[in-house]
Amino acid sequence: MEEERIYTIPLRDVTNKSPTTKRAPRAMRAIRDFLKKHMKSDIVKLDNSINEKVWERSLNKIPAKVRVKVVKEGDVVKATLIE
């Protein structure tokens, strides 16, 4: 059974609570943790487009939020960026 959802993931907490040199890696981790929590699965695969969006303006200027489309197939969760 396939389940599909659209989420807006806030990254403002990552910006406020992280040093500038660690924001992008922590944002990627925050996205993965958000999807694990909301989709109730441990296996989360992020599309390269999400990575490019977070790293687009370098290490320390991450976006405030990211909109993703999430598809759950069995136990695997796959996320892609919505433009």
Curated annotation (Swiss-Prot):
Belongs to the eukaryotic ribosomal protein eL31 family. PROSITE patterns: RIBOSOMAL_L31E. NCBIfam families: PRK01192.1-1. InterPro entries: Ribosomal_eL31, Ribosomal_eL31_CS, Ribosomal_eL31_dom_sf. GO terms for molecular function: structural constituent of ribosome. The lineage of its organism: Archaea, Methanobacteriati, Methanobacteriota, Methanomada group, Methanococci. Transmembrane segments: none annotated. This is Large ribosomal subunit protein eL31. Keywords: Ribonucleoprotein, Ribosomal protein. One of its GO terms (biological process) is cytoplasmic translation. GO terms for cellular component: cytosolic large ribosomal subunit. Pfam families: Ribosomal_L31e. The gene is rpl31e.
